[in-house]
Amino acid sequence: MNSYSIPPPRWHDRLHGWFLRIAASGLIPAHMFRPTLLPQAERQGASGHLQLEVVSHCWQYAYLLAYQLSSLVQFPPTRATVTMTVYYSREDTDTTALLAWFGAMQVPGVIWNWRELPKQALFRRAIGRNEAALQSRADWIWFTDCDLMFRRNCLDTLADLLQGRRDALVFPRIERCTAVLPAQDPLLNTGQALLRLMEVDDASFVDLPRTRATGPLQITHGDIARTQGYCRDLQFYQRPSATWCKAYEDRAFRWLLGTQGTPLDIPGVCRIRHETKGRYTSGDLNARLRAMIRRLGRAIKERR
């Protein structure tokens, strides 16, 4: 069996998943599941021109990834070098074409790094994140989603704020988000015109405070990433899957590091929220139910 073969189902898989979710709530000590964290004093407090790496995944979200990559072209860093790593599958032909188009661009301060995975490995996001964490040479690694953009002053301010820091995990205090957009919204309904720089009006976003390093906002110290990986020792989260897996490992990662993260005032962190989930089968009953549940959940939150 190669490393990306889908393992046969086991009777206890569902129980194992539930156990890890309960453990990650803090009810079980994280040190039982990982090696000792590198002490803060032994982490490099990098300064000067930093090396940053952004790690993103894309499956059937080329229309969102186009905005993310465009933001790096439109607002390239000047006080750091950013390696933009994207995990993708060649079966997603729109994303493959988009990466080829952007990959031909020379952008000051940006290094393109496209990492192909078979889709069964892509469907478990922790697999790519773990590979990137262990292989990265960056001072800091930003694990994110392909619907996030790095707009004006985002990466340069981040580089300034990270000077000399040794935190295990930091995150933006404010995330600027759109409303939850339906598939027919002009921002999402780009037709076939993906191979171009995508523009978005700053007025489309509102400020939303964040209290922890959620999945797209996990900015991790490079020494921590290289020694811990990304849920490396939770083998349940390193198993390929035939279908997209909900990213419960985001919470497990914070639990393993023993922190919700340190908030930083980073401008220009913008996300396009979207109702239709491209990673699920279009028209599928479960997909429609998920959309209904998301709408209901957001409506409840907005009324609080």
Predicted regions and their residues:
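Glycine-rich, basic loop-to-helix element that forms the pyrophosphate-binding segment
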Residues: 118-135
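Acidic donor-binding segment of Leloir-type glycosyltransferases
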Residues: 72-117
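The conserved acidic donor/metal-binding loop of glycosyltransferases
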Residues: 145-149
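Short, well-formed alpha-helical segments that are part of the catalytic scaffolds
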Residues: 61-76
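C-terminal catalytic/acceptor-binding lobe
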Residues: 2-36, 47, 68, 229-304
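Cell-envelope/extracellular polymer assembly enzymes that use nucleotide-activated donors
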Residues: 51-55, 83, 252
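Short aromatic/hydrophobic "clamp" motif used to bind/position activated sugar donors
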Residues: 141
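Conserved catalytic core of nucleotide-sugar-dependent glycosyltransferases
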Residues: 151-237
